[in-house]
């Protein structure tokens, strides 16, 4: 009896210790998120930095500190899970992308976007897969199967164009922004559909019948996922329109929109469809129909709530990727063969550059043949910008790599460990190095005139104080004349007159 009671007390103490560790981890992570937001805002106007790179660097620095404190045992305060990423973090990002998209530009360039996002991703997938198979077999990095090589193609075909989109201006370059933005979403969806199809099929003996079945399954998922997203968006519009006749409730409207959007994502997961495509088109349909059936207060609330959720999810992902990159367990397996890991990373970066160029320039040429107006054509500078925008790799690549090459985030197999560490290296290098060069490159290729910059500033200020679509001010216009939009906010000014900045 005494032994049983002692065992129970030990288990209770261990449980409390575990709960306390979780609370400490969450406190630290929330504090880091706040730091990322503040520093990202302060560094927003710099020539090189953006919020994604800021979060990645803060995550890496935090990982180093934790690694030193733990005596080299761990650099993590949370365990990475691809389920956490795909079920909780990705939905708000993709839904907000569809909800905030400028539909006129998106559908005007829909065929070009699908050309880049679907056909282009397939071309990149083929080049990376066969290039990796041909080169990695010579390096003898481990027993990778044909399914692994095809998965590598899908993993590194998934782009992350956040850095470029933060630099581009929707009002100054609507065509370019629409193409980069639309292609990024369709690209992620295509990569995930390809990855899921690879895992579903037995690809040990590929023949024409399996290839046709694979292609048929791919287009089946694409079409059905889009249809489900459209249906979910229309259902939300119908429910909100019929449910609150004469008695609109902002709380219920916002809650219903959020839940129905998330339901569309989970239904796609339930039926093994592309949840990314589903929730993206659900967001587009909701912004076109559902949004106009709610009150003005609900319009303002949903617009900013969805944007804030998406923003937090993006920062969370980059922060964790930076922290997880220094996890000692992943690098321990490959420490005896660092040259192989560096070689694999270099080859993957080269294949990414080649795979991207192999479709951007030829498909741009084909797209230009169908355009009559010079404004609708993609000139060489725009093509280079589109090519560059897709060179960064992010959390989608990380999550897919974990899914393919690890079990519960861990692996002791050399080939799998090399692929995980190489994925981390490619994500870090492309996000930081390519990301740092993005601002000056885009500014050089797409210079904004002084007049257009002034116009964009005026548009931003008008939309900040009064949204013409909503017919409702977002901020109070009292004392508007005292507000100087070009005034630089610094810590020195904050300490001199804190009331001016806090009230």
Curated annotation (Swiss-Prot):
KW Nucleotide-binding (keyword) present: no
Sugar attachment sites: 50, 293, 368
InterPro entries: Cation/H_exchanger_CPA1, Cation/H_exchanger_TM, NaH_exchanger
Catalytic activity: Na(+)(in) + H(+)(out) = Na(+)(out) + H(+)(in); K(+)(in) + H(+)(out) = K(+)(out) + H(+)(in)
Membrane disposition: Multi-pass membrane protein
Residues in compartment: Cytoplasmic: 1-22, 73-76, 98-109, 160-174, 241-265, 327-345, 407-416
Protein name: Sodium/hydrogen exchanger 3
Source species: Arabidopsis thaliana (Mouse-ear cress)
